[in-house]
A protein has these predicted regions:
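N-terminal subdomain of lithium-sensitive/metallo-dependent phosphomonoesterases centered on the IMPase/IPPase/PAP
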Residues: 1-86, 222, 230, 244-251, ...
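Residue-level signal for inorganic ion chemistry
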Residues: 21, 45, 56, 89, ...
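A short, compositionally biased
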Residues: 27-28, 99, 126-131, 217, ...
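Generic detector of well-ordered alpha-helical packing
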Residues: 46, 69, 85-88, 119, ...
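DPxDG-like acidic metal-binding loop motif
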Residues: 75-130, 150
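Short strand-turn-strand beta-turns centered on an Asx-Gly dipeptide
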Residues: 108, 135-138
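An extended, acidic
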Residues: 140-255
């Protein structure tokens, strides 16, 4: 299957949404609403998703769309775009530049293309499950095989205790060489780019995960849920740089 036309649209979506969102970042008085799930949302989130939806509908009107802010349409289509206009809205509204835009393309329910776009940092990562590039340059995961030599990342250090086995996570964290909360999509970019080794999120939505799967796999890494099961659909994510490290992490997280 030739993904070239979809890859072109994906990069166009990333650039267009980034240009829309950037002026809102760091703006004084930015209005923040709280959604029913207690997560924040802004005009930038909503406007960027509307923009991307419009571009997709114009280019591929038969494709489906699933977005964080406006839900799904034609989600049973052969091709479905999955959109998270601002992954890391809490970072966005507090002036932390590690937020990004996640864009994925599903083919018959599985992610085949993914993009992480960091507009403030000027980084665009694209993966197709076989290859992965950062600003057009091929990247690969590191070769770390043990937890003791690993840099471990997570978005919120308190979430494992809320949603998974907190004691197991804390024990794993104590074993790691370095632990940081460079989280949300930026953490997965660091794993795929070869700067970190493990990225964990104990609670995820489809728009959080879909783009990450072809990116991590394209960079040579392994991505599953917290029990080593299917990466998508899933409600949690473990991404590791090598199969050996992934096996060790999954074993450590076991209840």
């Amino acid at each position: 299957m030739d993904l070239t036309p979809y890859r072109f649209l994906m990069t166009d979506l990333a650039r267009a949404s980034g240009e829309f969102i950037r002026p809102f970042f760091g703006r004084a008085g930015l209005v923040v609403d709280i959604k029913a799930d207690a997560t924040p949302v802004t005009q930038a989130d909503r406007g960027a998703e509307e923009l991307m939806r419009g571009l997709i509908a114009k280019k591929f009107p038969g494709h489906g769309i699933l977005g964080e802010e406006f839900g799904g349409e034609r989600t049973d289509a052969e091709f479905v775009w999955v959109l998270d206009p601002i992954d890391g809205t809490k970072s966005f509204i507090t002036g932390v530049p590690l937020w990004g835009t996640l864009i994925a393309l599903l083919h018959r329910g599985q992610p085949v293309l993914g993009c992480i776009h960091q507009p403030v940092l000027g980084q665009m990562m694209l993966g197709d499950g076989v290859t992965c590039t950062l600003n057009g340059r091929a990247v690969r995961c590191r070769s770390t095989t043990s937890v003791e030599n690993a840099t471990l990342l997570t978005s919120d250090p308190f979430n494992p205790s809320k949603y998974q086995n907190g004691a197991a996570f804390n024990a794993l964290r104590q074993r790691a060489k370095l632990v940081r909360t460079w989280g949300d999509c930026y953490g997965y970019l660091l794993v795929a780019g070869g700067w970190a080794d493990v990225m964990l999120d104990p609670i995820m939505n489809p728009w959080d995960i879909a783009a990450l799967v072809p990116i991590i796999r394209g960079a040579g890494g392994v991505i599953t849920d917290w029990r080593g099961g299917s990466a998508f659909p899933a409600e949690s994510t473990v991404a590791c740089s090598t199969p050996e490290l992934h096996a060790a992490v999954i074993a450590a997280l076991a209840p």
